[in-house]
Each structure stands twice: as structure tokens, then as C-alpha cells.
A protein has these predicted regions:
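Hydrophobic core
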Residues: 19-25
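Flexible coil/turn and secondary-structure edge motifs
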Residues: 2-3, 14, 25-231
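N-terminal export leaders
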Residues: 7-8, 12-17
């Protein structure tokens, strides 16, 4: 059963359909270039990075559909274990960011490609401590790296995009080492898929339809070669 805390929070949409979609998907001055700097080829079979970019429902849905991603888990990063609970994190006072832990095969999809998706369709990196209708530090834009090479790639891509002025405003995305990741409650996992299937009855379908479904559609349209299963 969907937890009442998210029903209260998500159902109160403050903007209409057009405004919600516009606020949730980045607006560019030009299409995003591929990263000039990416990870070097390695023999690792799996790698993990944690990305924060607003409500984790849509972030998880997009990366779960990406080729080479074996796992996309909604959770919390940037705070302590003691208060890594949705009701507390939602106050915006714990230091956590709603995040998604992405485990991927670098031989199938590179970190640079994942970051291009992240900046293109997952969120608007020019919005400070908010995304669309959601406001608070828990919705901030942040990349939590697990290796120094990931840090190098992330910082280089942010600089590349900033220098190219592809966004109308400055990029506010933070880059920080991952200290810990705390898996979110089960009712948050695969939320968009469950909501689309109405399993269980989705009290937040309007929110998902306005804010998350367009991101997934945009990903499939812009990056068909990176869609899992080619569709």
C-alpha cells in the first residue's frame, strides 16, 4: 500500500500540465554534446555512481530503462543513516538528497553517456534546490562519485557544458564523494512503473504523468541507441 506521506506531498500539484512538464525537463540553447572526457576502457564488469536530480521516481525510471544498467535503486545520499527516512528527509533538514544508485556495465554504457542522459532529460541542472513542483535541498542536483575517475569525468563535463552555454542559466550541480547510500523504502522502488500499471492504485498518477512520464519518453526519443532492449 502506498504510504500516506507521499500521497499528501505529491497530490498537491502547484502548476498545470504544461507548466509541470516545462519545469521538469531542461530547456537548452542547443542540443547537448557528448562528453569530451570519459572514463578510460577498463576490465571492470560493474561500476556504481549515485545521481540526485529531483524526485527519485523519475530518475530511477529513466536509468532503469538504460542499456548496460543492471540496477537503479531509489534512496538517500548526503546525510546520515539515523534519519534516512522519507518522512524526515522530506523536511529538507537532514542533508540528504533523493538519489538513485546506478550499477552499470562500463563495457555497454559509459559514465559519460549516463551523465549526458542525466543532464539532457532527467532534470534541469540550473534549478537550485528544486525540480519542477518540488522544492527543498533534498531535490538538489548532485553527482556522488565512487572513484576519482568519475569525479574527473563529471567535473570535466560540467565545465564543457558551462563553456558551451547550452543552458539559459548557470549549472548548479554539485560533485561530491559518496559517503553512504541508503536504500529508500520499498514503496518508492519502481514507482513510475507501478503507477503506470496502477499497481497498487496510484494516488500520485497525475504527478507521475506530468513530471516523470515525459522524461522517460524524452529519453527514448533522444537516445534510442541507449534504450535497454532497443525500445
Amino acid at each position: 500500500m502506498i504510504h500516506r506521506a507521499i500521497v499528501t506531498k505529491r497530490i498537491a500539484l502547484r502548476i498545470g500540465l504544461a507548466g509541470a512538464i516545462a519545469a521538469s525537463i531542461p530547456i537548452y540553447a542547443a542540443s547537448l554534446p557528448s562528453p569530451a572526457v570519459d572514463e578510460s576502457r577498463n576490465e571492470k564488469k560493474t561500476e556504481t555512481v549515485v545521481l540526485a536530480g529531483g524526485c527519485f521516481w523519475g530518475v530511477q525510471a529513466v536509468f532503469d530503462a538504460a542499456k548496460g544498467v543492471s540496477s537503479a535503486v531509489s534512496g538517500y545520499a548526503g546525510g546520515s543513516k539515523a534519519n534516512a527516512q522519507y518522512e524526515i528527509v522530506s523536511t529538507g533538514t537532514t542533508g540528504h538528497a533523493e538519489s538513485v544508485q546506478i550499477t552499470f556495465d562500463p563495457s555497454q554504457v559509459s559514465l559519460g553517456q549516463l551523465l549526458r542522459i542525466y543532464f539532457s532529460v532527467v532534470h534541469d541542472p540550473t534549478q537550485l534546490n528544486r525540480q519542477g513542483p518540488d522544492e527543498g535541498t533534498q531535490y538538489r542536483s548532485e553527482i556522488f562519485y565512487t572513484t576519482e575517475e568519475q569525479r574527473r569525468v563529471a567535473e570535466a563535463y560540467i565545465k564543457q557544458l558551462s563553456d558551451a552555454k547550452v543552458f539559459r542559466g548557470p549549472i548548479v550541480t554539485k560533485v561530491a564523494p559518496l559517503q553512504a547510500f541508503y536504500r529508500a523504502e520499498d514503496y518508492h522502488q519502481d514507482y513510475v512503473r507501478h503507477c503506470q500499471q496502477n499497481l497498487p492504485v496510484c494516488a500520485n498518477k497525475r504527478y507521475v504523468d506530468y513530471n516523470d512520464v515525459p522524461k522517460l519518453a524524452s529519453f527514448r526519443q533522444q537516445f534510442p541507441e541507449l534504450v535497454k532492449g532497443g525500445k
